[in-house]
Amino acid sequence: MKTVGQVMKSPVVTAKAGDTLADLVTLSRQRHMGHFPVVEGDKVIGIITDRSLREASTHPAVYNLLLDLLASLDRGLVEQIMIRDVITAPPETPVVDAVKLMREHRIGCLPVVKDGKLVGIVTASDLLWDLAAQEGQRQG
């Protein structure tokens, strides 16, 4: 049975709590990514998703900045909108269990953590691509 460790992406593009939202939006566009674990050293302390960024304008901390009409994203920080209760998985987690976990928590990615350190990330898209590749091998 395939595990998360076999499907995950590594190294992981991460954010720090003190990064500006403007920097993160730029990084998201450059890398075509929508999930950024927020780390302190190697430890995951939060996560920013494309949904977090879309909803940032309604978050009180960022909304107040938007009212100022002054480069609000340059002054808003990742830590103001990051999700702090991060659902993670160890590399040996079976893919089927990862899918169940993502569905149960209605999340689109799982940071992969080993011994408390971030080692990779797996997204719903990664799992779908892997499933499609497996199906193609079976048929072909």
Model-derived regions, located:
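Tandem CBS (Bateman) regulatory domains
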Residues: 1-11, 49-87, 99-103, 123-140
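The conserved cystathionine-beta-synthase
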Residues: 15-32, 38-40, 88-106, 113, ...
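Short, charge-rich amphipathic segments
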Residues: 29-37, 56-59, 63
